[in-house]
Amino acid sequence: QIRDIMEANPEKIRNSQSSIVRDLIERAVRVKAEVVSEDLRESGRREILNYGHTLGHAIERAERYQWRHGAAVAVGMVYAAELALAAGYLDETIVDRTRAILKSLNLPVGYRGDRWKELLETMRRDKKARGSLLRFIVLEELGKPRVYEVPDDSILYMTYQEIAE
């Protein structure tokens, strides 16, 4: 599994020329191609590929696209994990594991606390939003994504405090 390889080899993954990085990219592309081929119109399963992207895209915009996409999505992944924990979908050990893996790869796991209102406004314009409900891809367990329509902005804000710096 991709996550296990990342967890076991952070020093090799930090070297973009390593064979492990090539292997991970090939694995990720195969997974993405499989998901896309099952849902060409992004009306169902393909939505899982947006894991970490709702907040990640808002961070990219807030930073005027000066952040790398992967760094912004990494923060979004931690936020999605924290949302899943708050909703009772995910165990705290998986949230901690997610943070640890991303940190070991020198990726950010938090973002500025003073940008919340701007991020929320941007997320409301996200293609995945449905009316006043923001939709996030979260995990119920490793390898088992689901859509979470967050019922209340207070949940979003309280969860953001878990990643705010």
Protein language model regions, located:
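Short alpha-helical scaffolding segments that buttress acidic/His motifs in well-ordered protein cores
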Residues: 24-32, 77, 102, 123
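Residue-level signal for inorganic ion chemistry
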Residues: 53, 77, 142
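C-terminal charged capping/lid subdomain of soluble metabolic enzymes
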Residues: 2, 89-165
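Short glycine/threonine-rich catalytic loop with a Thr-x-Gly-x-Asp
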Residues: 45-51, 67-73
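An active-site-proximal "capping" alpha-helix that borders the catalytic cofactor pocket
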Residues: 70-85, 97
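Active-site His/Glu-centered metal-binding helix of metallohydrolases
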Residues: 51, 55-59
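Carboxylate- and glycine-rich phosphate/diphosphate-binding segment that chelates Mg2+/Mn2+
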Residues: 1-49
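Catalytic Zn2+-binding segment of zinc metalloproteases
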Residues: 58-67
